[in-house]
Amino acid sequence: MISGMQRHITFRDGQQVCPLGQGTYQMGRRRNEEIKALRRGVDLGLTLIDTAEMYGTEDLVGEAVRDCREQAFIVSKVLPSNASYEGTKRACERSLMRLGTDYIDLYLLH
C-alpha cells in the first residue's frame, strides 16, 4: 500500500471497505486468468470490485466472488439510458442475475 494511505474506509454502519478497488472495464478476453486475479485481489484485501452493465463483466465478477461474496464489496452501475425509476429497477435486477447474488453493495449511475 501507499505510505500514509488509509487501509479502510469505515461507513456509518461500521462496514469497512478498502479505498483501492479492482476495475473490470475491458475484462473478459482472458476470463479464467481474470477470475483468478480478482479472487487473488480479494484474498489480499482488495475487496472493492467495480463493474457495470456496460462493461459486460458482471457475470465474470459473480463467478470470481462466488465463494467469498461476504468479503467482496461490489460496485455496479446503471446506464444512463436505463436511468428512469422503472428502468433502474429492471437494470438492477438484471445485474443481480448476472452477478449471481441477491445484493449489490453500491449501485451508481454511470
Identify the function of each model-found stretch.
Residues 1-72, 102:
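N-terminal binding-site loop/beta-alpha segment at the start of enzyme catalytic domains
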Residues 26, 39, 43, 66, ...:
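Glycine/proline-rich, positively charged
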